[in-house]
């Protein structure tokens, strides 16, 4: 899990219970990756899975496309920032010249927030913007730390990744959301396939960044596991909707060799999820989840809120440009403890979450 939910303390608490802890390094800089992997080792022993995105080339949007996407966020910006607040820059804009940040008009209407000005600069004026990290540079920080597992989301990494990982005897896992992707993974040199069903929270691991909402081969994680176990030789790891011991047993019965759990741990005391995120996970079972591109430009499942509803028919940039475009908005929403404009990633079975320690959750899983 990435996005601030995953912390050193969170992963270490999982390791202490005898489980493999996964740390999402999606957008992390190399120095942060080294620091966090070393910090985990200092706090606990056990297997660590370092997880990365496989980014695909993306073209900078036209000025018109950027303006449309920025304008689509205006209602959310206005809901979060009062006219008095609008003269104070949001995160990321402190280094911009004053003339690049729009101010409220004389009529009191809000101009573009500072994070939008920041995106105009970075998206249109940089060939290698910071929101598109180099996988090579990220992994250069990983190899010396020797995590027990490397895993990848959004596709098969370059061949050199497998060469180095195999040389260092580090297994490589890759997410698949349908059989076609799983067969590509099997031919790549990976050691196992993570079968990510449609119930899973967070980003869908689809290889195609513009995959439609209804393109899944399977209607559930269990069905996907069954299909992949029948057609693939590699071990299959079930992910998505695995919340309790019964879910684990159901996945294993269909051919999974292991399971990967995310949402079940989100409401744990040690989780880095925001207080309002945890509150909604355990206190609003009827809120429901939705697959949306609104926050990042790629399909991701999270709790429904005002932002996901507002953005259903509005302009969205390609991934990961939209992620950068909404960064300031999400940060401002978190500072205001307002869950309606945060990316509250969660699987469709989130109502089974409990407010408890990681230790208590693992005990429940073992005793059932």
Mark where each language-model region is.
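Active-site entrance/lid segments in N-terminal catalytic domains of soluble metabolic enzymes
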Residues: 1-231
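Conserved active-site-proximal phosphate/metal-binding subdomains
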Residues: 74, 78, 200-237, 242-368
């Amino acid at each position: 899990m990435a996005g601030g939910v995953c912390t050193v303390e969170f992963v270490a608490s999982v390791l202490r219970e005898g489980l493999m802890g996964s740390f999402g390094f999606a957008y992390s800089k190399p120095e942060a990756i080294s620091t966090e992997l070393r910090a985990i080792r200092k706090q606990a022993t056990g297997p660590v899975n370092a997880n990365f995105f496989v980014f695909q080339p993306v073209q900078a949007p036209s000025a018109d496309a950027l303006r449309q996407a920025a304008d689509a966020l205006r209602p959310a910006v206005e809901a979060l920032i009062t006219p008095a607040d609008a003269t104070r820059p949001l995160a990321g804009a402190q280094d911009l010249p004053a003339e690049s940040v729009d101010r409220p008009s004389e009529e009191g209407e809000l101009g573009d927030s500072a994070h939008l000005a920041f995106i105009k600069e970075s998206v249109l004026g940089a060939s290698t913007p910071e929101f598109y990290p180099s996988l090579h540079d990220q992994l250069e920080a990983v190899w010396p730390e020797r995590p027990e597992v490397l895993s990848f989301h959004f596709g098969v990494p370059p061949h050199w990744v497998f060469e180095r990982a195999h040389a260092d005897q580090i297994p490589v896992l890759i997410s698949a959301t349908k059989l076609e992707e799983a067969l590509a993974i099997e031919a790549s040199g990976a050691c196992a396939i993570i079968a990510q069903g449609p119930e899973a929270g967070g980003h869908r691991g689809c290889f195609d960044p513009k995959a439609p909402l209804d393109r899944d081969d399977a209607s559930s994680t269990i069905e996907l596991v069954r299909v992949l176990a029948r057609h693939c030789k590699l071990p299959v790891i079930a992910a998505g909707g695995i919340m309790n011991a019964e879910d684990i047993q159901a996945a294993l019965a269909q051919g999974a060799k292991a399971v990967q759990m995310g949402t079940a741990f989100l409401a744990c005391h040690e989780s880095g999820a925001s207080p309002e995120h945890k509150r909604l996970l355990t206190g609003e079972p009827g809120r429901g989840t939705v697959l949306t591109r609104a926050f990042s430009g790629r399909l991701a499942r999270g709790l429904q809120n005002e932002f996901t509803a507002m953005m259903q028919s509005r302009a969205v940039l390609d991934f990961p440009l939209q992620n950068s475009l909404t960064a300031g908005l999400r940060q401002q929403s978190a500072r205001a403890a307002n869950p309606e404009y945060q990316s509250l990633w969660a699987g469709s079975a989130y109502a089974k979450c409990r407010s408890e320690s990681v230790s208590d959750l693992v005990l429940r899983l073992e005793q059932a």
